């Protein structure tokens, strides 16, 4: 009952937050006006006819940005919950394990090579390639005789992350000033200027990858029992790890291609809900999806209203919130006595 109430509350809070976020900007729109425009956009007739300016602001400027926050936040939180479940480690997340660094290398390659200027589809595609290469390296380094050491996965993730960040710096070294400034702006993580075309390609890939994660809820719960117990219950542990790692890499890359490398969402949100509603992934993944979406919508809204007319990029907000929490987790693990799985 408690889990259902948490999920219902998160869903309602997300809807309210999205309506408020769509209404706030240089031109303030009341919530009723926003709802009216959205209903008419769905083909439903309402009593009041919105102006063409209100319709354009809601449907073509603010709604894509808010939906981008929902998609990016929800996806990163789901991926974080899955990684924490697979590796039985509260510090596991796509950015900590190096998958985000691989996606970033693919993205900066698209920017530096000029492919991004030829079309918005090149950045997400190269981000996926980079994330898959990072995931493959991590799995190959940490595997021995068909088995994967959970401790070595984390260590390999840190090593691969450092390698890819170094390659990013090397690419920037040979780029012109415009490309460097463009990438630095992108690395802060932000949703400014997001339009429907930026969501067109990533969304189908995201849906497939996230669906794969939801189809493995039972396996994620079995990982909590330990790999030997999972083997004895008939689960193909290594094959399941590979599937989940690929799905996480694709979903993370697509999310990063939309909002940049927004950090700590995949670490902070699922860990909080694991404490709140327990480790059962049948409820943890939906709660993490809604919680991550709500968290990023509110962070983006906060960045817009703190010092108007200037905006603080959402990646800065999440870093300011997530970094202290990450340090708290590290200190708590040390005090409890960290034991490698």
Stretches with model-predicted labels:
Residues 1-341:
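Alpha-helical transmembrane segments in inner-membrane proteins
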């Amino acid at each position: 009952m408690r889990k259902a109430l948490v999920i219902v509350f998160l869903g309602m809070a997300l809807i309210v937050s999205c309506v408020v976020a769509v209404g706030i900007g240089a031109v303030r729109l009341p919530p009723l006006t926003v709802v009216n425009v959205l209903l008419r956009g769905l083909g439903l007739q309402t009593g009041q006819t919105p102006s063409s300016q209100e319709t354009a602001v809601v449907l073509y400027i603010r709604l894509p940005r808010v939906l981008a926050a929902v998609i990016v936040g929800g996806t990163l939180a789901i991926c974080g919950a899955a990684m924490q479940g697979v590796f039985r480690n509260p510090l596991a997340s796509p950015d900590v394990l190096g998958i985000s660094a691989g996606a970033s290398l693919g993205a900066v390659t698209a920017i530096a090579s000029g492919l991004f200027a030829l079309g918005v589809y090149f950045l997400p595609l190269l981000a996926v390639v980079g994330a898959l290469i990072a995931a493959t390296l991590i799995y190959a380094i940490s595997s021995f005789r068909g088995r994967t050491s959970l401790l070595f996965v984390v260590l390999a993730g840190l090593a691969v992350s450092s390698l890819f960040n170094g390659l990013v710096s090397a690419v920037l070294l040979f780029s012109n000033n415009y490309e460097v400034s463009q990438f630095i702006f992108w690395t802060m993580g932000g949703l400014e200027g997001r339009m429907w075309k930026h969501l067109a390609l990533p969304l189908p890939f995201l849906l497939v990858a996230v669906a794969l994660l939801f189809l493995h809820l039972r396996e994620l719960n079995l990982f909590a029992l330990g790999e030997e117990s999972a083997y004895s219950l008939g689960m193909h542990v290594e094959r399941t790890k590979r599937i989940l790692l690929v799905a996480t890499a694709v979903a993370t890359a697509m999310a990063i291609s939309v909002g940049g490398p927004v950090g700590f969402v995949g670490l902070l949100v699922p860990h909080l809900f694991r404490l709140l509603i327990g480790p059962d992934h049948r409820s943890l993944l939906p709660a993490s999806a809604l919680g991550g979406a709500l968290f990023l919508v509110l962070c983006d809204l906060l960045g817009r209203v703190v010092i108007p007319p200037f905006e603080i990029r959402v990646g800065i907000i999440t870093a300011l919130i997530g970094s202290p929490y990450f340090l708290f987790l590290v200190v708590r693990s040390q005090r409890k006595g960290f034991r490698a799985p």
